[in-house]
From Swiss-Prot:
This is Imidazoleglycerol-phosphate dehydratase. It comes from Ruminiclostridium cellulolyticum (strain ATCC 35319 / DSM 5812 / JCM 6584 / H10). It comes from the Bacteria. The lineage of its organism: Bacteria, Bacillati, Bacillota, Clostridia, Eubacteriales. CDD domains: IGPD (cd07914). Belongs to the imidazoleglycerol-phosphate dehydratase family.
Length: 194
């Protein structure tokens, strides 16, 4: 089973993350931020992976360290779970609607970290989650997993719907990119490495 287990302890956060790429969509998420937990569960469910997030952060300050550091640990766990990347499809793209919202996520497990985040939020908060932190979370995941990640909101006005569509689409794109394909010998690159 392709799994990644990361423990990250700083003066601001204590985090344990486990990701199993070949799962069924089971997730336990406890970050202390209800809406963020909900998004992690959706990501896992729609990515058909199993995950565990146990996070204690300095929420008395704000949610920044908790959300960003969870993204760092999650990215490292995904990187670890991918191992040598042999026979993976490498690319994944998903369009996900959520009522009036429509989001595109396209990614490459290239080990060339990059984030293009094309989204605007009309509200500063959804529940206890600062909407500015959505971009910071995805940046942390992309740079620590080695993902070229594009996220584009094609339509939407409700911040909850937009963010939910992002996390679902990211899960589906990761699932697509991490699938094993027996036709691929080694890694999917003319360079012979990713």
């Amino acid at each position: 089973m392709r799994e990644g287990l990361v423990t990250r302890n700083t003066k601001e956060t204590q985090i344990n993350v486990k990701i199993s790429l070949d799962g069924k969509g089971d997730c336990q998420a406890n970050t202390g931020i209800g809406f963020f937990d909900h998004m992690l569960v959706l990501f896992t469910k729609h990515g058909l992976m199993d995950a565990y997030f146990d996070v204690k952060g300095d929420l008395h300050v704000d949610s920044h360290h908790t959300i960003e550091d969870t993204g760092i640990a999650m990215g490292l766990a995904i990187r670890q779970a991918l191992g040598d990347k042999k026979s993976i499809r490498r690319y994944g793209t998903a369009y996900v609607p959520m009522d009036e919202a429509l989001v595109l996520v396209s990614l490459d497990l290239s080990d060339r970290p990059y984030l293009v985040f094309d989204a605007q939020f009309s509200q500063p908060m959804v529940g206890q989650m600062d909407t500015q932190m959505v971009e910071e979370f995805f940046r942390a995941v992309a740079f620590n997993a080695g993902i070229t990640l594009h996220i584009k909101v094609l339509h939407g006005s409700n911040c909850h719907h937009i963010i939910e569509a992002m996390f679902k689409a990211f899960g589906r794109a990761i699932d697509d990119a991490t699938r094993l394909d027996t036709r691929i010998e080694g890694v999917l690159s003319t360079k012979g490495t990713l």
